[in-house]
């Protein structure tokens, strides 16, 4: 897409939600640390900002912990050695005195046995800092969607909506993903100042959820600002085939509406859940996988925006805008024949096929899922450049972007 000055266009990664003890076990001598860093290779850091997370779930378990050099560089102040036996409730209670009750706002906490680092985005958000609330679970599912798209993403989880700024300021974060906002995308201020800082000043990407109603996304503080990637919902694999569900109108792209995601109050449980809240972090995961692969190809073993680029080495300089534009070109329009007019399904009961005439009026640039990852990688490394979309699509999306720029300027 042809943008005006890209002052307001460096993407971030965010979430959209509805409207310890110091580790003495992770020790390396200096020689081990050097070897570990050399072996670690490329990585990405995704920052979901949401209700909380369940680090006990098997979905987040890793065979190796994050290395000490990484924790030091990230600014980790505390490591929680999580209990590995018992029910979810028993594990939480067993760890209260050594972990949960010790966490303060000033802490950056690593949960051993995972690649999850957490912090409080705002004080007093919940009774147990960072841990997902017993009556919620949104943040755990959101993070699960990131990991489904990129199992090797490092997670920096921020509990509470004010955590966007903390994620934006952290130099090692690549993508912020947010899945919260008022129902109906009513035009009120929200996190736009913090996401703009993350994208335009820090060079990150931000993915923001459009509303779950049919309201336009333009005025939505989470997904509407021009520097944010606004994401609506699309049923990728349902009983009725590929279906557009009711969710924010005029998004940047659409992604999978219904997913099977981890429970917030169990060790192994999963549930089907729907909404742009989960389409959004899935997109963040896809983008993080692309960034990680490009860093691997170019020998970039750092993270965050550096010198204006998310991939930065002697042979490469790829910005958040470059990645966003490539995503726009690689996204695809489903064929109307893939729709099966059966019984309505899912949380939204007005699912319809994607129009064969002007699909971009429903999907924006199109669907983003893991199948297009290699196309984006090969476009950005120059091995197989992508072309622009058809003139009608480019013109329509330019008009939507102009409206967003006008509204948020």
Question: Where does each model-flagged region fall?
Answer:
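Gly/Ser-rich catalytic serine loop of serine hydrolases
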Residues: 131-140, 213, 271-284
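Extracellular S/T/G-rich loop segment that most often corresponds to the catalytic His/Ser-adjacent loop
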Residues: 105, 220-296
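Loop/turn elements at helix/coil->beta-strand transitions in domains of secreted/extracellular proteins
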Residues: 42-46, 150-155, 171-176, 200-206, ...
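Subtilisin-like peptidase catalytic core
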Residues: 51, 115-190, 235, 301, ...
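Active-site-proximal beta-strand/loop segments in catalytic clefts of secreted hydrolases
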Residues: 48-52, 145, 149-150, 157-162, ...
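Secretory targeting signatures
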Residues: 1-27
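C-terminal subdomain of the subtilisin-like protease fold in secreted/lumenal serine endopeptidases
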Residues: 173-177, 292-409
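Active-site core segment of subtilase-fold serine proteases
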Residues: 28-32, 36-140, 144, 153, ...
């Amino acid at each position: 897409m042809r943008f005006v000055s890209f002052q307001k266009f460096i993407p971030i990664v965010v979430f959209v939600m509805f409207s310890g003890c110091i580790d003495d076990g992770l020790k390396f001598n200096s020689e081990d640390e050097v070897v570990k860093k050399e072996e670690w290779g490329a990585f990405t850091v995704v920052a979901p900002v949401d209700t909380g997370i369940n680090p006990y779930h098997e979905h987040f378990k890793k065979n190796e912990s994050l290395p000490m050099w990484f924790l030091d560089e990230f600014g980790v102040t505390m490591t929680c050695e999580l209990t590995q036996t018992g029910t979810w409730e028993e594990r939480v209670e067993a760890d209260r005195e050594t972990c949960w009750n010790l966490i303060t706002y000033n802490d950056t906490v690593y949960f051993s046995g995972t690649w999850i680092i957490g912090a409080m985005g705002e004080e007093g958000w919940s009774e147990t800092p960072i841990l997902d609330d017993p009556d919620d679970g949104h943040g755990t599912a959101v993070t699960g969607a990131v990991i489904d798209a990129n199992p090797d993403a490092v997670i920096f989880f921020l509990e509470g909506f004010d955590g966007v700024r903390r994620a934006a300021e952290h130099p090692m974060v690549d993508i912020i993903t947010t899945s919260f906002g008022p129902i109906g995308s009513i035009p009120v201020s929200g996190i736009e100042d913090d996401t703009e800082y993350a994208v335009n000043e820090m060079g990150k990407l931000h993915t923001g959820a459009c509303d779950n109603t049919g309201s336009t996304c333009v005025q939505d503080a989470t997904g509407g600002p021009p520097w944010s990637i606004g994401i609506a919902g699309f049923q990728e694999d349902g009983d009725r085939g590929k279906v557009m569900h009711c969710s924010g109108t005029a998004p940047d792209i659409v992604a999978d509406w219904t997913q099977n995601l981890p429970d917030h109050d169990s060790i192994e449980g999963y549930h089907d859940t729907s909404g742009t809240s989960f389409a959004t972090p899935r997109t963040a995961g896809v983008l993080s996988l692309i960034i990680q692969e490009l860093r691997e190809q170019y020998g970039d073993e750092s993270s965050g925006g550096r010198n204006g680029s998310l991939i930065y080495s002697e042979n490469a300089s790829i910005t958040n805008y470059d990645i966003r534009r490539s995503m726009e070109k690689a996204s695809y329009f489903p064929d109307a024949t893939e729709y099966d007019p059966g019984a309505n399904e899912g949380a939204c009961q007005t699912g319809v096929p994607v129009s064969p005439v002007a699909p971009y009026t429903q999907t924006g640039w199109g669907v983003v899922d893991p199948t297009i990852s290699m196309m984006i990688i090969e476009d950005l490394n120059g091995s197989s450049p992508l072309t622009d979309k058809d003139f009608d699509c480019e013109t329509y999306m330019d008009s939507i972007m102009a409206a967003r720029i006008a509204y948020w300027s």
